[in-house]
A protein has these predicted regions:
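Catalytic Walker B motif of ABC-type/P-loop ATPase nucleotide-binding domains
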Residues: 177-181
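Conserved ABC ATPase signature
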Residues: 152-160
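Hydrophobic anchor residue at the start of the ABC signature
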Residues: 166
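Q-loop/switch helix immediately C-terminal to the Walker
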Residues: 108, 114-127
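Helix-to-loop junction immediately C-terminal to a conserved catalytic motif
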Residues: 69
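Conserved ABC ATPase "signature" region
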Residues: 133-148
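ABC ATPase NBD coupling module
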Residues: 86-103
Length: 228
């Protein structure tokens, strides 16, 4: 395990870590090969680039992000991180990847409703060994949720919870940020504020971005658009 952890630490700081999809087809996705779809093709992705993931409901946007994060395994084909097949990663290796390499904002947010907003944020930063109370305050103020930090999450609006989930992801180390329809309950102004902060932090870290959306591109100018 010690050798594997050391290997992952070295892997996570490579300047151009790549993901390759090789003929991937998730179970439950219609078996219909389309010209512009990412399914059943060879696709090379760089973790320091920006991608817009588009598709209608049920076409696999969330599934694609879940495959990258290693939480969905029922698919045919292969996914390589670096030169390694992610199916062969053990649970400890995935835990390290999710702490240091890939961060995600889930569509259902996955906040703990009985805890305060600050407690939800602090749990994640403690797990990532990066206590950042001052940064929490600063970023929460930028996203307009500083006044809600001491409130239980279940009392917040879904839009406020979305901003907290975005903040939680930004506070952890990452090489790429996976966003699953993160602005669905935000007005255009708050969506723009969130996206500006996301792009700013990604640029500071030379990190990549995968933004899944039904249709709206939120003004993002991606390096590549991916269709599912």
């Amino acid at each position: 395990m010690e050798r594997e952890s050391s290997k992952l630490t070295r892997l996570s700081v490579l300047p151009q870590l790549k993901i390759q999809l090789q003929d991937v087809r998730p179970e439950g996705i219609p078996n219909k090969r389309e010209i512009h779809s990412i399914w059943e093709r060879k696709i090379d992705l760089d973790l320091n680039r920006t991608y817009l993931v588009r598709g209608a409901s049920g076409r696999g946007k969330s599934t694609f992000l879940h495959i990258l994060l290693g939480i969905r395994r029922n698919y045919s084909g292969q996914v390589l991180l670096g030169e390694e097949n992610i199916r062969r990663f053990c649970s400890d290796k995935w835990a390290l990847i999710r702490q240091n390499t890939l961060a995600m904002v889930f569509q259902d947010l996955r906040l703990l409703g009985e805890l305060t907003a600050r407690e939800n944020l602090s749990i994640k930063t403690r797990l990532a060994e990066s206590p950042q109370s001052k940064q929490i305050e600063e970023l929460a103020e930028r996203l307009g949720v500083k006044e809600q930090l001491e409130q239980p999450c279940h009392l917040l609006s879904f839009g406020q919870q979305q901003r907290l989930a975005i903040l939680r992801a930004l506070l952890q180390p990452f090489r790429a940020l996976l966003l699953d329809e993160p602005f669905s309950h935000l007005d255009p102004d708050n969506s723009r504020i969130c996206l500006d902060l996301i792009l700013e932090i990604c640029e500071e870290r030379n990190a990549g971005l995968f933004l899944a959306t039904l249709d709206d591109d939120y003004g993002l100018n991606p390096d590549q658009e991916l269709r599912v």
